[in-house]
From Swiss-Prot:
Name recorded for this polypeptide: Actin-6
Single annotated GO MF: ATP binding
Gene name for this UniProt entry: SAC6
Record-stated family: Belongs to the actin family.
Compartments where found: Cytoplasm, Cytoskeleton
Length: 17
């Protein structure tokens, strides 16, 4: 889910951040 991190790095809802 790298897309989510690139789109919303502040939220980091993907779990990788």
């Amino acid at each position: 889910m790298a897309d989510a991190e690139d789109i919303q790095p502040l939220v980091c809802d993907n779990g990788t951040g």
